[in-house]
């Protein structure tokens, strides 16, 4: 496969990594053209075994295009990551068309669901690590960003916090 874009996702890209944070590497790739001409389906993700340091997975270009059409918020995050490991000219061209597919409604549903899920998973226990509060606050702030600006939110927690209006 040929990698078109490789970025960091997760707490490192959000700006609140802890000493024990792993590297969440995400990438977009293209397979040999023969794979796209097959009648049977070819797996459209690559997932490497996760360990304490690395969590690496990627999406095939065809899957990426389908997800763009559906305004997948995770895809928008990957393309706005402040930590880029590899980037081809494809990434710039892709970013130029992404805005046409952004849906505030789909993004709001995604981030509200993420905040609720993270709240249930991380904050309803006796002992809560400080970092876990950020896992709830970040999607809440991204919702505020989307409501105020109508654009995809930035990856960095700091930017979501600084560039949204305070609560009345």
Residue ranges with predicted function:
Residues 163-168:
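Conserved small/polar residues in nucleotide/adenosyl-binding loops
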Residues 152-162:
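Short, charged amphipathic alpha-helical segments flanked by flexible coils
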Residues 10-51:
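Catalytic metal-binding acidic patch
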Residues 11-14, 31-33, 120, 141-142, ...:
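Short, solvent-exposed loop/turn segments at secondary-structure junctions
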Residues 1-7:
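Helical scaffold of the NTase/Pol beta-like nucleotidyltransferase catalytic core
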Residues 8-10, 57:
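Short His-Asn-centered micro-motif
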Residues 47-144, 148-149, 161:
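Conserved NTP/Mg2+-binding pocket subregion across the NTase superfamily
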Residues 4, 23, 134:
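Residue-level detector of short, conserved catalytic/binding motifs and their immediate flanks
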């Amino acid at each position: 496969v040929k990698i078109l874009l490789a970025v960091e996702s997760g707490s490192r890209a959000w700006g609140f990594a802890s000493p024990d944070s792993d590297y969440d590497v995400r990438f977009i790739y293209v397979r040999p053209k023969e794979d796209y001409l097959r009648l049977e389906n070819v797996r459209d993700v690559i997932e490497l075994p996760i360990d304490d340091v690395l969590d690496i997975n990627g999406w095939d270009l065809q899957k990426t295009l389908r997800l763009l059409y559906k305004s997948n918020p995770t895809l928008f995050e990957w393309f706005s990551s402040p930590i880029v490991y590899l980037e081809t000219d494809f990434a710039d061209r892709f970013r130029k068309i992404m805005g046409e597919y952004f849906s505030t409604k789909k993004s709001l549903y995604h981030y509200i669901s993420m905040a609720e899920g993270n709240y249930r998973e991380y904050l309803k226990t006796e002992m809560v690590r400080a970092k876990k509060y950020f896992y709830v606050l970040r999607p809440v702030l991204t919702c505020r960003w989307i409501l105020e600006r109508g654009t995809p939110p930035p990856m960095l927690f700091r930017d979501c916090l600084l560039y949204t209006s305070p609560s009345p």
